[in-house]
C-alpha cells in the first residue's frame, strides 16, 4: 500500500507498473467472470487405488499470484506445503483408512454418498474432515503467536495506559507514534459490549450467562484480532482465512455457554452471534494493521488514522447490511432456503459445528482432526526453534502451513508460483552482483534490485486491485441476472492457466528490468 501511494505521488514508471497490473487483472476477471472462458478453480481427482484418492487444482486468480509476489518465496512455500500436506498426504490417507468414507457413520451418510461419487470426494473429505487439521494448527499457532508477541503487546498496553494520562497532544511522544488515548479505546469497547450483553440476554434469558458471553466476546475478539492481523500480513487481508479464526471463536463461545448449562435451541444462535462479532473484528484487523503500517512507512499520524478507521467502521455498518440483504433477495431467498442459491459453505460449516457442540455427540467427529493439527503445530514450532538455533536462514512458522491446510489446495498454488517469480528475480540480481565483484559488469546493482523489487510489488498490487474491482462489477451483473456467459462448446481452463503463467513471466520481467537495463549499458561501454 505504501509503495502504491509513493508511486502515485511520484508518477513515472512506478505508476505505470501499477496501471499495467490493474489492467491485466481486470481483463482476466472479465474473461473469467463475465464471459466464463475458464473456471476460477479447475480441479481434478486422481485415484490412487480402489479407495484412496487425492485432489489437485489451480485457482486462476491473478490476485493470489500478486500475493505470492508480495510475500515472497519463503512464506509462499510454507503455504504451499500446507496445501500439499492436506490434499496430497491427508486426503489419500483418510480415504484409504477412515471408516466413514465409504460406510455410513456418525448418524449420517458416508462421505462418498455426500460427494455423489469419487469426482467430488476429495473436496468433501477436505471440507468435512481434513481442514480441521488446519483449525487445530491455527489454534496452537495463534496461541504461540500471542506468546511470542507478549512483550510487544505488554509494551503497547503499558504505553497506552501512560498515554491515557497525557493525551494525543503530548509533545514527549513523537508525532508518528501518537495513538488515541487508551482510556478512549477502553471506554469504547465497554460501551459497545453493553448492548451486546442485552442482546445475549434476550437470546438466552440468563443475565449472568449473557454478561459472561459478552466478556468472552471482547477477550476472544482482542486475541483473535491480533491473530487475524498476523495472518493478513502473511497472505494479505483478502485471503486471510478469517473463517478459521471464527471457528475457534465459535468453539470458545460454545464452551462458555456449556459452562452455564445452556443447551437446546438457544445455544447455537448465541454462539453464532459471538462468532460473527469476532469474525468482523478479525477481518478488519488485517485491513487496519495494513493501513497503519502504510501510514508508518509514509510518516502519518496514527491517532488520525485510527479516528478515520472508526468513522469507516460506523459507515460500513450502515452500508453492508442492506447490500448483503439485496444479494440474498436476488438469490431467490425463501423461508425454506433463507440464503437462496448462495452456497455459503463457511456459514453452513459454522452452523453445523454449533449444532454439533450442543448435541449429544458433540465434536467427536472433528476432535481427532483438531488434535492432529495441534500436534503438527507443535512439531513445526520445535522445528522452527531448532533451525533458528542452528543459524539457518529458513524457518517453519506455524501459521502459513496452517493456512495452506485450511484453504483449498488450488489457492496455495498461485501463491507459490508468485513467490517463485519474485525469488527468480532476486536470484538474478544476486548473480549480477557476483559478476560485478568479479569485474565482469559494473553498476549500482543494489539500487537496481531495490527498484526492481518495488516495481514487482506495484505490478502485483495492480493485479490484486484490478481483479477486485472487476470482480465487484461482475458480481453485480450476475446478481441482476444479466446474461454474461459465453459457451463455445469446449473447455478453456488451459487458456486461463496459460494467461496466468504469462502474468508470472511479466512479474519476473518487471522485477529484473532495471538489471537488464544495466547489462545493456555495460555492453554499450
Model region roles, listed by residue range:
Residues 1-525:
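Alpha-helical multipass membrane-protein architecture
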Amino acid at each position: 500500500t505504501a509503495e502504491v501511494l509513493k508511486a502515485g505521488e511520484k508518477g513515472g514508471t512506478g505508476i505505470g507498473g501499477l496501471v499495467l497490473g490493474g489492467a491485466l487483472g481486470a481483463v482476466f476477471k472479465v474473461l473469467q467472470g463475465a464471459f466464463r472462458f475458464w473456471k476460477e478453480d479447475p480441479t481434478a481427482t486422481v485415484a490412487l487405488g480402489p479407495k484412496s484418492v487425492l485432489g489437485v487444482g489451480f485457482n486462476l486468480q491473478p490476485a493470489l499470484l500478486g500475493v505470492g509476489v508480495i510475500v515472497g518465496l519463503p512464506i509462499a512455500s510454507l503455504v504451499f506445503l500446507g496445501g500439499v500436506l492436506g490434499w496430497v498426504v491427508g486426503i489419500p490417507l483418510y480415504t484409504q483408512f477412515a471408516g466413514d468414507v465409504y460406510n455410513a457413520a456418525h448418524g449420517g451418510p458416508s462421505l462418498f454418498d455426500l460427494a455423489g461419487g469419487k469426482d467430488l470426494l476429495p473436496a468433501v473429505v477436505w471440507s468435512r474432515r481434513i481442514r480441521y487439521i488446519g483449525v487445530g494448527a491455527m489454534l496452537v499457532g495463534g496461541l504461540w503467536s500471542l506468546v511470542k508477541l507478549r512483550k510487544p503487546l505488554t509494551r503497547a498496553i503499558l504505553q497506552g495506559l501512560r498515554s491515557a494520562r497525557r493525551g494525543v497532544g503530548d509533545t514527549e511522544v513523537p508525532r508518528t507514534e501518537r495513538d488515541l488515548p487508551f482510556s478512549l479505546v477502553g471506554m469504547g469497547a465497554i460501551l459497545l459490549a453493553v448492548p451486546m450483553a442485552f442482546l445475549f440476554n434476550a437470546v438466552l434469558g440468563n443475565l449472568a450467562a449473557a454478561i459472561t458471553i459478552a466478556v468472552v466476546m471482547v477477550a476472544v475478539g482482542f486475541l483473535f484480532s491480533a491473530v487475524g492481523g498476523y495472518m493478513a500480513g502473511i497472505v494479505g487481508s483478502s485471503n486471510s482465512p478469517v473463517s478459521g479464526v471464527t471457528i475457534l471463536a465459535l468453539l470458545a463461545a460454545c464452551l462458555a455457554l456449556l459452562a452455564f448449562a445452556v443447551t437446546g435451541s438457544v445455544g447455537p444462535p448465541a454462539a453464532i452471534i459471538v462468532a460473527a462479532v469476532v469474525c468482523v473484528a478479525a477481518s478488519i484487523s488485517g485491513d487496519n494493521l495494513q493501513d497503519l503500517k502504510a501510514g508508518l512507512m509514509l510518516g502519518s499520524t496514527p491517532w488520525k488514522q485510527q479516528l478515520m478507521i472508526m468513522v469507516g467502521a460506523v459507515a460500513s455498518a450502515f452500508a453492508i447490511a442492506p447490500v448483503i440483504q439485496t444479494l440474498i433477495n436476488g438469490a431467490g431467498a425463501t423461508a425454506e432456503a433463507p440464503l437462496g442459491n448462495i452456497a455459503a459453505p463457511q456459514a453452513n460449516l459454522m452452523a453445523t459445528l454449533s449444532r454439533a457442540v450442543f448435541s449429544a455427540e458433540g465434536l467427536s467427529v472433528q476432535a481427532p482432526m483438531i488434535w492432529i493439527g495441534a500436534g503438527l503445530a507443535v512439531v513445526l514450532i520445535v522445528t522452527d526453534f531448532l533451525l533458528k538455533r542452528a543459524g539457518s536462514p529458513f524457518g517453519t512458522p506455524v501459521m502459513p502451513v496452517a493456512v495452506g491446510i485450511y484453504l483449498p489446495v488450488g489457492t496455495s498454488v498461485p501463491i507459490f508460483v508468485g513467490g517463485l517469480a519474485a525469488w527468480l528475480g532476486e536470484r538474478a540480481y544476486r548473480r549480477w552482483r557476483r559478476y560485478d565483484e568479479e569485474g565482469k559488469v559494473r553498476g549500482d546493482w543494489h539500487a537496481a534490485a531495490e527498484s526492481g523489487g518495488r516495481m514487482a510489488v506495484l505490478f502485483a498490487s495492480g493485479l490484486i486491485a484490478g481483479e477486485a474491482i472487476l470482480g465487484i462489477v461482475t458480481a453485480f451483473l450476475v446478481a441482476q441476472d444479466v446474461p454474461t456467459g459465453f459457451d463455445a462448446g469446449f473447455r478453456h481452463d488451459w487458456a486461463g492457466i496459460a494467461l496466468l503463467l504469462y502474468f508470472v513471466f511479466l512479474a519476473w520481467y518487471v522485477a529484473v528490468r532495471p538489471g537488464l537495463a544495466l547489462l545493456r549499458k555495460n555492453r554499450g561501454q
